Amino acid sequence: MRCPFCRHDDTQVVDSRVSEDGAAIRRRRRCSACDKRFTTYERVELSLPFVVKKDGSRTEFDRRKIVASMQLALRKRPVAADAIDAAVARIEYQLLATGEREVRSEKLGELVMNELRGLDTIAYVRFASVYRRFEDVSEFADVIEEFRRASPAKTPRKR
């Protein structure tokens, strides 16, 4: 594989691991010319459905867009990159399992929100506020109240 830093063709695999969800192989590589290290991922290439946007246009499913939107919602939150990758892999699996050739962007947004809900409550609220186009504070309060009803009361932490 070509080095992304110096473009040299000779790189060695230093470490290989199966990702958390088993859907990819993570490889650490070292360039023999510049000695820099980088990470690559090996995944099975599958035919994911086209995304039908609200205006009716169609676009190819882009994993990078899902990862980027989740990373934005999770910015400065204590969630590992591997957890994001695993969540995106679950979304892809759900899309593949439908067998459909198209998925509405609204459905895709709901899948992302479901994954964020399991990863981080704050990220879920951030994403929901943009995705559902919150217009006032009461909509934030509604989502927070929904979480309070869904989870049992927690005892306050001692400081």
Curated annotation (Swiss-Prot):
One of its GO terms (biological process) is negative regulation of DNA-templated transcription. A zinc finger (unnamed) spans 3-34. One of its GO terms (molecular function) is DNA binding. Keywords: ATP-binding, DNA-binding, Metal-binding, Nucleotide-binding, Repressor, Transcription, Transcription regulation, Zinc, Zinc-finger. Residues 49-139 form the ATP-cone domain. It comes from the Bacteria. Binds 1 zinc ion. Its cofactor is Zn(2+). It holds the Pfam family ATP-cone. Negatively regulates transcription of bacterial ribonucleotide reductase nrd genes and operons by binding to NrdR-boxes. Belongs to the NrdR family. PANTHER family: TRANSCRIPTIONAL REPRESSOR NRDR. This is Transcriptional repressor NrdR. It comes from Burkholderia cenocepacia (strain ATCC BAA-245 / DSM 16553 / LMG 16656 / NCTC 13227 / J2315 / CF5610) (Burkholderia cepacia (strain J2315)).
